[in-house]
Curated annotation (Swiss-Prot):
The keyword Phosphoprotein applies. Disulfide bonds: none annotated. GO terms for cellular component: cytoplasm. Homotetramer. NAD(+) binds at residues 14, 35, 67, 81-82, 121-123, 146. This is L-lactate dehydrogenase. Its main location: cytoplasm. PANTHER family: L-2-HYDROXYCARBOXYLATE DEHYDROGENASE (NAD(P)(+)) (PTHR43128), L-LACTATE DEHYDROGENASE (PTHR43128:SF16). It catalyses: (S)-lactate + NAD(+) = pyruvate + NADH + H(+). CDD domains: HicDH_like. The gene is ldh.
Length: 315
């Protein structure tokens, strides 16, 4: 029986939160940790060995490794990069500091001969996913930036609190940038099979307030504990689970919605063993559509500047 192997690149708070979530769920048989600071990957590997010993579904191997370990991996998860600074730094303001890191990672992963699925959480995640995909030349569907999966989870939670229902019974998505230009798609939200608008009507001002709460959640967390990691760690494990078990489940990840574009952007799509496919056909209201287009245009502009600053000549 083939073992399920993941290589984690970036052993900071986000990477290790993913690792802990994945280990608890018994997702992989082999875990390989890589970090620019070798002692960090070694120390975490040893620490997780101890946790693994008492897990109900222990992994067969947890070790610190190198990019050569990517060659036969099923999934590579990338969380490396510098985090947002407290005080309101946006994800897009991180781009200059993280693009060069992602370019180097992408080159190393490609050179290893890796042919699996890549899941990315490094911020700004849509831009980092776009850089990674273009540098590697991997099939677009095999690159899965986390997109708006965390934003959508936050929206689910905020709406569910207000209508007093389990979030699992609510289907509602955030689309666009994983960041300040995202759009909460209330028009397509549903409770069970019932449109949210028929289950509980929210005014436009209430919707704006909910969306603001969703968008400010990350800043609230960063300003109080310096970083977000448990939420996104759980989201990364959820994406990996969908890939490993070929669930073909709809998740709001970052995808190349336009085949002729290099831009990855948050949108619900089916996720399974071959990556993402079959983007959901959402009928957006005019205001939602304008917001999504504005978000796309913003990401496109940032990516073009980023690509040029990396010394690439296509733009």
């Amino acid at each position: 029986m083939k073992t399920r192997k993941v290589v984690l690149i970036g052993c900071g708070a986000v990477g290790t939160s993913f690792l802990y979530s994945a280990l608890n769920q018994g997702l992989f048989d082999e875990y390989v940790l890589i970090d620019a600071f070798d002692n960090l990957s070694k120390g975490n590997a040893w620490d997780f060995e101890d946790a693994n010993a008492i897990m109900s579904t222990p992994a067969g191997m947890i070790k610190s490794g190198t990019y050569e370990d990517c060659a036969d991996a099923d999934v590579v998860v990338i969380t490396a990069g510098v985090p947002q600074k407290p005080g309101g730094e946006t994800r897009l303001q991180l781009v200059g500091r993280n693009a060069k890191i992602m370019e180097e990672i992408a080159t190393n992963v490609k050179d290893s001969g890796f042919d699996g699925i890549t899941v990315i959480a490094s911020n700004p995640v849509d831009i980092m996913g776009s850089v990674y995909a273009k540098v590697t030349g991997f099939e677009p569907n095999k690159v899965i930036p986390s997109g708006t999966i965390l934003d959508s989870a936050r929206l689910q939670w905020e709406v569910a609190k207000r209508i007093k229902i389990n979030p699992a019974s609510l289907e509602v998505y955030v689309v666009g940038e994983h960041g300040d230009s995202s759009v909460s798609v209330f028009s397509q939200a549903s409770v069970g099979s019932i449109p949210l608008s028929k289950y509980r009507k929210f005014s436009d001002s209430q919707k704006r307030a909910i969306h603001k709460d969703v968008m400010r959640k990350a800043y609230k967390i960063i300003n109080t504990k310096r970083a977000t990691f448990y939420g996104i760690g759980a989201c990364l494990a959820r994406i990996c689970k969908a890939v490993l078990r070929d669930e073909n489940v709809i998740l709001p990840v970052s995808i190349k919605k336009n085949a002729d574009s290099d831009i990855y952007i948050g949108w619900p799509a089916v996720v399974g063993k071959d990556g993402w496919h079959s983007p959901l056909k959402l009928t957006l209201l005019a205001e939602e559509k304008r917001g999504f287009q504005k978000s796309y245009n913003s990401l496109k502009k940032v990516f073009e500047v980023t690509w040029s600053e990396l010394g690439r000549s296509e733009y």
